[in-house]
């Protein structure tokens, strides 16, 4: 940690960042799938497209013949353990079904939502992809999602959902942790609450099994997720606590 602080103070950390090769970011041939005409409407932003080789691939269905969703696999090795994440954009009304298919197909038990609310500045930044009340059940083409518990903390909410097939067969319980103090256009104003949130996420993830992917989303799928993954892995490496 002291070495990193020294790099920040001297500015050398910025030189390291500038030295990162830009070839992948500037090579449009590496993300063709998301630009196909049948997939364009499944992207929240036209300029935020997953790489073809790391994108999450769903089983093709009639409603989505390409099996496309704007989401990417992220794997980080810490010592002898590989931690898996899926970084994705917030669901659109069109992609709610695919979002839950992704959860089912990738054996996901933990979902992290880095969005304070579904609406911001009179604009929907996330579709309502889960029920907010126990008496309400979300039904998609293939699944039923039921809220079974909710704990409201100072800056985050912990929910648990039961996921069923449409004919009532139980698939799994999904833990959902929403950080409510993150404005879509700003960093959190207070760091400790976010650290507490990440610690809670890590605790829940250990309960369900750290080797299973953790799904993380904000609005675009590229900013807040990286902060969460980096913070979690830094904590795992004992860089911060």
Regions found by a protein language model. Give the residues of each.
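Cys-based phosphatases of the PTP/DUSP/CDC25 superfamily and their flanking regulatory architecture
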Residues: 1-241
């Amino acid at each position: 940690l002291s070495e990193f602080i020294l790099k920040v103070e001297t500015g050398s950390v910025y030189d390291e960042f500038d030295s990162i090769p830009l070839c992948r970011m500037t090579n449009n041939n590496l993300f063709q799938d998301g630009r196909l005409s049948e997939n364009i409407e499944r992207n929240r932003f036209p300029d935020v497209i997953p790489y073809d080789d790391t994108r999450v691939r769903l089983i093709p269905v009639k409603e989505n013949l390409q099996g496309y969703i704007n989401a990417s696999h992220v794997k980080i090795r810490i010592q002898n353990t590989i931690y898996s994440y899926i970084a994705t954009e917030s669901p659109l009304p069109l992609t709610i079904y695919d979002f839950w298919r992704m959860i089912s197909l990738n054996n996901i038990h933990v979902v992290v939502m880095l969005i304070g609310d579904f609406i911001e500045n009179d604009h929907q930044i996330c579709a309502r992809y889960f029920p907010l009340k126990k008496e309400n059940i979300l039904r998609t083409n293939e699944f039923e999602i039921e809220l079974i518990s909710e704990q409201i903390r100072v800056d985050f909410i912990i929910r648990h959902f039961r996921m069923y097939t449409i004919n009532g067969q139980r698939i799994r319980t999904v833990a959902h942790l929403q950080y409510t103090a993150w404005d879509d256009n700003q960093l959190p104003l207070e760091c400790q609450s976010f650290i507490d949130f990440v610690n809670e996420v890590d605790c829940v993830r250990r309960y369900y099994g750290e080797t299973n992917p953790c799904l993380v989303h904000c609005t675009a799928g590229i900013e807040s997720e990286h902060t969460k993954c980096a913070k979690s892995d830094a904590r795992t490496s004992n860089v911060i606590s």
